[in-house]
């Protein structure tokens, strides 16, 4: 009899533990549906303090911790420029930091000086008219791990199915939500100067490799195959506890094309101007029709083109 009682007690405790783990996972967002849409951005123009990082996105946790420790009340932000599924981890680029101000408000000189004292740089991002957006609960450290494996694949699918030009990837941590945002306009204004510098170096390396290949008749380096063609464009805007990055990111990308940066994956896609609007969202913002397609009839091939076929 005592043995049966002991076994029953062990079984009850095991069941209670499983129910607790399931409840914790559900609270972290395991059962939360991921809805991706296009519309107005969740934020206005912002000024951020950031540090640039080249390497695995899973190694950015200390940057989140550092920025949060300086001013815990500020929202954290991360901007990811490369697709970690196609770019080697040691070459992935991102900017991590805190949002100092939003809209017409300017950050205080004291706050700017404080972040600069710890090696952060100051930069401004505009508010694009349209973005691809998604949200996910931010309640526990597990939420970050779940978001990396559920939201990013959903964003990839949404963008590729509609052939959108949406880059780079932004994550904004605000209270109990993680806001994911991919600009559909003014993308170049979201590229910090360090990205342009690394792109310039990659371009110079590719040109040097091409020159060496032309001179020897054989390709002696594969450096040109990994050059990142970001094309950030010209900027119109400039400016002189949980660790969100602690979760190891495992973004899924089923496409087997040779894209590297997010800008390359959508370089041939359409912008929001080529899509039909579905109407207004719950806050009055315009929404894009999920079934929208490119406007215009298919182009007839000219005579030379037919001849080539």
Curated annotation (Swiss-Prot):
Positions in the Cytoplasmic compartment: 25-309
PTM annotation (Phosphoserine): residues: 238, 243
Entry GO terms, CC: autophagosome membrane; cytoplasmic vesicle; cytosol; endoplasmic reticulum; endoplasmic reticulum membrane; nucleus; replication fork
GO molecular function per UniProt: signaling receptor activity
Basic and acidic residues bias (residue ranges): 250-262
Residue ranges of the TM segments: 4-24
Segments of skewed composition (Low complexity): 208-225, 263-272
Organism in which the protein naturally occurs: Mus musculus (Mouse)
Main location, first listed in the record: endoplasmic reticulum
Alphabetical list of PANTHER family matching this protein: TESTIS-EXPRESSED PROTEIN 264
Lumenal side stretches: 1-3
Role: Major reticulophagy (also called ER-phagy) receptor that acts independently of other candidate reticulophagy receptors to remodel subdomains of the endoplasmic reticulum into autophagosomes upon nutrient stress, which then fuse with lysosomes for endoplasmic reticulum turnover. The ATG8-containing isolation membrane (IM) cradles a tubular segment of TEX264-positive ER near a three-way junction, allowing the formation of a synapse of 2 juxtaposed membranes with trans interaction between the TEX264 and ATG8 proteins.
Keyword hit for DNA-binding: no
Keyword DNA repair listed: yes
Region (Disordered): 193-309
UniProt-recorded name of the protein: Testis-expressed protein 264 homolog
